[in-house]
Amino acid sequence: MPVLTPDSALSLGATWSQVRRSAHERAIAAPFPTIDEETWRYSRIGELDLATFAIAETPTTITGESSQVTVTRVPASSASVDSSLADLFAQSTSTDLFNSLNLAHMDVVVVSVARGVVAPQPIVITHTLNGDGSVYFPRLVIDAAENSEVTVVERFISDDGVRSLVVPVLDARAAQSARVRYLAINELGDKSWQIGEHDSVGERDSDTLLATVALGGDYARVSTAARLRGQGSNTRQVALYFAGGTQMHDFRTLQEHAAPRTTSDLLFKGAVQDTAKSVYTGLIKIHNNAKGSVAYQTNRNLTLSHGAWAESVPNLEIETN
């Protein structure tokens, strides 16, 4: 699949075209990150050369669909999209390079759960990323309406020896009293890279879980932001990871309390051996209006070899008493 340009985007529907064009322009304007930036400190971003990858459509299979849950697929090659979905993406103003690249080239899966509906079984989305020299941009949207419940599992798979890059983005929204459970499983091969972003928003009395199992990849990074926007909302972030050889797992997290009496709980546990590395940096941010909020943040690492290395940097920012 060729690289999308502002001119080639003209063939898309009006709003859809503008979404992709704007994202493409933001990506061009965005500087390539360096380890001098706090959010990329300790990373291996200096080893990545985007020019060596060709954009490919994401091979995806989905199981667990049911009549109670709407699952919509919109591949990057689609010339048009539902207006409500286009309007949703049009609201994105992120200037982050990788988020903008994803928005410009995304293969989208949307999971929508209506008010009061409890999904009867987990929805499992599997991306098989075996194109050597390919870059993939899957994007998952989970939209859980009031008092609904859904569990989504997203798997990323590639074979050893396949040099690929995957840049996934998750947008999860839990309306009032909704329950959203998300699990990402990294089963990538030894030459694959991942630079991912998970973002959830919880409204009043909602409950969200963002979980990650990271086992594969040469360099695998996930930035996770759980935002509590409604009073009484709750979120958990959990990760389990293991790295060997020269692997590196890189986690950056945000627990944002923007409403009163909200609760967040984070537990990341992992082990590294040989000359493998892991990085965890996390921020708990409690806004001035988030009185009565409670937050927990725990990162535990087991170093199994003298050459292995684990970095852990917790941070706290409180604007209220």
Where are these regions (language model features)?
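N-terminal amphipathic, basic helical "cap/leader" segment at the start of enzyme domains
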Residues: M1-D107, V124, L267, Q273
